[in-house]
Every structure is written in structure tokens, then in C-alpha cells.
Amino acid sequence: TPLAICRNRLEMLMEDDSLSEKQLEELMKTHQTLEYITKLNKSLLLLTKIDNGQFTDTKQLELNELLKQYLQDYEEVYDYRNIEVTIDEQDIFNVTMNESLAVALLTNLLKNAFVHNIDGGHIRITVTKNSITFRNSGVENPLDKEHIFERFYQGTKKEGSTGLGLAIADSICRLQHLSIRYYFEQKEHCFEISRQ
């Protein structure tokens, strides 16, 4: 893609030993901006594909297993910020859906719980037969539940965040006839996916 070509050219330029520190710093800022644009582009493309119903291949999935698999991938990052993660599997949440969309749904909620958490905080995940709830520590005020699932909405601006993660999760849930809701309870931000 043109963005990948630009990124590669920029990376090659950054390897030039004749660059001054100031020039290298400016190139690094440009590289960060390009990374953000690439991430934004991927998210918008995914939303468009979801909206156009382009994910037709489905299969029976056990969301518990997918969740545990991706939790392992994030383990090191959570440890770095000293965020304690617990998962309470009360039952198995089975669903028939596209596996890529299931992964996007779960990873967006995991990323959200991490990005909007505090150092030394926690993430508690509860899985039942009909729901998965992500609870995380974070800012001590509820978020605007009227706008939280809107595209580009950001309750608290985080560097590198596109403001599309929860909009993607919401679109996937609507496509799969699941519901997603946000609530604030006992100083925890809670996102619950459930069957309609």
C-alpha cells in the first residue's frame, strides 16, 4: 500500500548516519504520525467491511478459548504496567460467527481495558453462557455512555488511540445480533457483551 511504501522509505532515511539529531527527531515524529494514519486506515477499512457485510464465513467458536489465547499475547504488556488480570469462567460462551470478527471484538475490548487503565490497576473478566463482562479500573468517573460507542469519540484522549475500537466492537455486535453496553459500577468501567 502507499502508506507502507512511505513508511519503508522513511525508515530507510532514518538509517542515514549523516542526519543531525534534530532531523532524526523530526523524522521519528513523522514516522509516528504515519503509524497512526496506518492504524486509522486499517480501522476504517474494517468498519467499512463490517458495514457492508463482507464477513460471511462463520463457524462455531468458543469465545473463552479465543479470549485466553489473546490474554496470553497481552500478558507481557499488562505486567509492564503492573495490571492484574483475572478471568472467571463460569460457563462457556459459544457463538457462531466469523473468527476474524470474534478476534477483533475481543482484542478491541482487551486493548480498551489496558489503554484506559491505571498503572497497578486491574482487569476482571467474567464469562457466562450468555455474556462476557470486562471490568477495569481507570478514571474514577463514569464515561459518557450516550456517545462511547460513536466513531472517533474519546472520553479521555490517549496517544495513538483512534477512537474507533469501541465503535468496531459495537458494529461487530450489531452484525452478530449481540448487544454491548457500558456501565460504571463500584469504580469500575464495565463493558458487557451478551446475547440479545
What are these regions (language model features)?
Residues 59, 79, 84-94:
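Conserved catalytic submotifs in the C-terminal HATPase_c
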Residues 112-114:
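Short helix-loop "hinge" at the ATP-lid/N-box region of the Bergerat-fold HATPase_c
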